[in-house]
């Protein structure tokens, strides 16, 4: 038995084996992204919403004004798309800032599909 194993290990490299080894990279799955949404209410001043969009989302005045109008007319608008951690932070910042200024502004996040 020992002899058979030894003979198998001495096989010549040119034995007709045509298998090819290929290195495959494991596919890294991208982390899911989350939409940050601003919701309309009847009490938060439009100017405050524009200020929030400029301050926490880095939008210029014209961009912030457009999104504020969308929120006002449609009831909701996507403000941005971020990783989970960043989206969560932005929602918390907006909600905290609105509460400190006694506005009922709502900001939420949802997984992008």
From Swiss-Prot:
GO terms for biological process: protein catabolic process; proteolysis. Belongs to the ClpS family. Residues 1-25 are annotated as: Disordered. NCBIfam families: PRK00033.1-2, PRK00033.1-5. Pfam families: ClpS (PF02617). Involved in the modulation of the specificity of the ClpAP-mediated ATP-dependent protein degradation. InterPro entries: ClpS, ClpS_core, Ribosomal_bL12_C/ClpS-like. This is ATP-dependent Clp protease adapter protein ClpS. Binds to the N-terminal domain of the chaperone ClpA. Residues 1-11 have a biased composition (Basic and acidic residues).
């Amino acid at each position: 038995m020992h002899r058979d194993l030894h003979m198998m290990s001495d096989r010549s490299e040119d034995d007709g084996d045509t298998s090819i080894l290929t290195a495959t990279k494991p596919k890294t799955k991208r982390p899911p992204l989350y939409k940050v949404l601003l919701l309309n209410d009847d009490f938060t001043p439009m100017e405050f919403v524009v200020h929030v969009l400029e301050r926490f989302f880095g939008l210029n005045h014209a961009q912030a004004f457009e999104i504020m109008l969308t929120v006002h007319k449609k009831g909701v608008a996507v403000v941005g798309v971020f990783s989970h951690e960043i989206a969560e932070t932005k929602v918390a910042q907006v909600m905290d800032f609105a509460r400190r200024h006694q506005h009922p502004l709502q900001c939420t996040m949802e997984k992008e599909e």
